[in-house]
A protein has these predicted regions:
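Mobile gating loops/cap/lid regions near enzyme active sites that modulate substrate access
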Residues: 451-625
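N-terminal secretory signal peptides that target proteins for export/translocation
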Residues: 1-24
């Protein structure tokens, strides 16, 4: 079948399309052609730098979670400058610190409940997300192309050749069959001798799953941060009474009572309040596109033109190996929309979700394999959040209450779990993961944590700075130093032993039981803990987040209208502006997410949105002591080389190109 060239710069071919798919392709091909020249990486153009004609090709929109190519192109563009961290900073500046994901999150092949769209309409074409049968590809001739040359293209995937003749300066867009090679041949006709160039096009679709806890999920980095109001919102204290109330910035556009007195306790006020919250890729798990796992998968797709990445994010904030990976766990938030509330209260075990997805994929494509698992887990197992609470909760009333309810952790209990229980849990996890990755745990890339409490390589000094969002918070210097030392000297080294079967950790078959371990980012994190400050930090941070813990107006009359002592509005805070700290402090957690966790029975949480419990939870449940988007980007930079090595991608992608000088056509007398 011959396909006519488009009237603009490009042409499209279709292979074995249904009439409806053909119609959809015709709708998108114009836009695809217009951007084809822009998306070609510099390496592709450089292939013909020596003057020899070559066929250059790349998969379009090859991070398949994205429905629309424009969301992928912003990453390919900014990643050309170098690292994922540099890309994140560039995107942050471009968005004025509001974040690149705030628009992308609504254009994905997985919805906020975690349901995979099958099929998923990507750039106007319906595709199976888990089991693609074809991929969109752009092909062009590179090198010293003769002026005015005409290219006769032929594509053959075994079902007969498809042909199109266009100007050689124009790209060709077509959908390549998955699982079989397509032979691409171009005959170049010009005033010079005719030439023929041939290559094979075969897309490698890489299936990656992301597993783990809040570090893996991207906690602390909502895809669309909460919009805060510039006036104050009242919280009660556990001591009660007007004298113990305090004001902090509220949620923008909230029409209810801002004072503690007269608040709506019916429950409807809470629902209205929740509609104004931050938005996440998955609210139940505080799953975010800023997660290092997602950023590394995007970068992998950007770096290699001949692959596509099918990515399944399953990590969940609060997950342990026992509750989260093997068993169900409590959800962090419900999904609130204007028409409904989705709130099951629990999240299905990640390993169960992964097995189900693989089983569904193999029913359609029996040869479909899981190529890579990205994993970070273990911090919740040793109750790291309890250790953090023990460091920052300073008020006597709150400490007494939280000690009785088990919120405050202890180093002794954490150390006992690290030494006795965590090795057993890792052994069980290895046995569960091994059959999912073909029997070789090298395909599990375990990325360790950065120490969150260091600056200049030493523990942060402590104090209220970064934590004065709640009156009872104050990072105790002694407890902070002990926890930082425990993390650095005991927890992180033990995780490495567990992943690599070292340090006395017994594995059944060390040669196949060792995970691929990543910790190269830890040195950089030693200069970017939660207390790191720089003259280049955002002006809002420098003016409004006090180094002495005096960020908020203490007089409740004045605070009701001007809660910040700096006099600026909370709406000026930019969650994704570049800053020295790569770890969210409690102030960041509140200003970025202001989370009211709802993943439990409504009877277990107060209906009054001014209640003292919400005051504490909203300060920490949005990601206090978790990496920022920059921190996640640094982790992704560390993980990416390990991923490419395991996948055998290495450096430049191999390409077999055959060139022939064709005989000149005989001249007729």
């Amino acid at each position: 079948m011959t396909v006519r060239p488009l009237p603009l710069a490009g042409a499209a071919l279709r292979f074995a399309m249904s009439p409806s798919l053909h119609t959809a392709m015709r709708r998108i091909v114009l836009g695809a052609v217009l951007v084809a020249g822009a998306v070609m990486p510099q390496a592709a153009v450089a292939q013909g730098a020596d003057g020899a004609l070559q066929i250059s090709w790349e998969v379009r929109n090859r991070f398949r979670l994205f429905r629309e190519e424009r969301d992928f192109l912003i990453h390919t563009e900014t990643l050309r400058a170098g690292s994922i961290l540099a890309s994140e900073d560039a995107l942050a500046v471009r968005s004025d610190g509001r974040g690149w994901a705030r628009n992308t999150v609504g254009r994905l092949c997985i919805d906020p409940t975690g349901r995979i769209s099958e099929p998923c309409t990507r750039d106007g074409v319906k595709e199976s997300y888990l089991t693609p049968t074809e991929h969109p590809v752009t092909v062009r001739l590179a090198g010293a192309i003769p002026v005015g040359a005409t290219c006769a293209w032929t594509f053959d995937d075994g079902d007969g050749p498809r042909q199109s003749t266009v100007d050689c300066a124009e790209p060709i867009n077509f959908r390549a069959r998955y699982g079989r090679p397509t032979t691409a041949t171009v005959d170049v006709s010009s005033a010079d001798a005719p030439q023929r160039v041939t290559t094979q096009i075969e897309v490698r679709d890489i299936f990656i799953a992301g597993l783990g806890d809040s570090i893996a999920s991207g906690e602390g980095n909502p895809d669309k941060p909460v919009a805060l109001s510039d006036d104050g919102f009242c919280f009660q204290s556990y001591l009660g009474g007007p004298a113990n109330q305090y004001f902090r910035p509220g949620r923008a556009n909230f029409k209810g009572a801002r004072a503690c007195e007269g608040g709506d306790t019916s429950g409807s006020g809470l629902r209205t309040w929740q509609l104004l919250g931050a938005q996440w890729l998955n609210p139940a798990c505080h799953r975010s596109l800023y997660s290092y796992q997602t950023r590394a998968a995007i970068a992998l797709a950007s770096q290699y033109q001949h692959i596509a990445v099918t990515y399944l994010p399953l990590a969940c904030t609060g997950a342990t190996i026992t509750e989260g990976l093997f068993g169900s766990q409590r959800a962090r938030e419900c999904l609130f929309t204007r028409n409904a509330v989705t709130c099951t209260g629990t999240v299905e075990a990640q390993l169960s979700q992964l097995r189900d997805a693989l089983a569904a994929a193999r029913r359609r494509q029996p040869s479909r394999q899981l190529d890579l698992v990205l994993l970070s887990v273990g911090a919740n197992d040793i109750d790291f959040s309890g250790l953090v609470a023990d460091v920052i909760v300073d008020g006597a009333t709150e400490r007494g209450l939280f000690r009785r309810t088990g919120v405050l952790g202890s180093l002794d209990d954490s150390r006992a779990t690290l030494q006795r229980e965590l090795p057993q849990r890792f052994a069980r996890l290895r046995e569960a993961l091994k059959p999912l990755v073909g029997g070789d745990l090298a395909h599990v890339v375990y990325t360790s944590y950065g120490n969150p409490a260091l600056t200049g390589g030493v523990p942060c000094p402590g104090g209220p700075a970064g934590f004065d969002i709640h009156p009872s918070f104050n990072a105790d210097p002694g407890r902070l130093q002990r926890v930082a030392a425990y993390v650095q000297r005991e927890f992180l080294p033990r995780l490495k032993d567990l992943a690599l079967c070292d340090g006395g950790v017994l594995c059944r078959d060390p040669s196949s039981d060792r995970m691929t371990f990543v910790d190269q980012h830890q040195q950089a994190f030693a200069d970017h803990g939660f207390c790191a400050r720089s003259s280049s930090d955002p002006e809002f941070d420098k003016q409004c987040f006090s180094a002495t813990g005096e960020s908020f107006t203490s007089d409740i009359v004045a605070a009701s209208s001007t809660p910040l002592t700096c006099g600026r509005g909370a709406s000026e805070f930019r969650a994704y502006a570049p800053r020295a700290r790569w770890i969210r402090d409690a102030n960041d957690s509140y200003f970025a997410a202001m989370t009211y966790p709802q993943g439990v029975s409504s009877s277990a949480l107060p209906a009054d949105i001014h209640d003292a419990t919400w005051g504490v939870l909203s300060a920490v449940y949005g990601g206090a002591i978790h990496p920022t988007a920059e921190g996640h980007a640094a982790m992704a930079d560390a993980a990416l080389p390990a991923m490419t090595n395991v996948l055998g991608l290495g450096g430049a992608e191999p390409s077999t190109i055959i060139r022939e000088q064709l005989p000149l056509a005989p001249v007729r007398p």
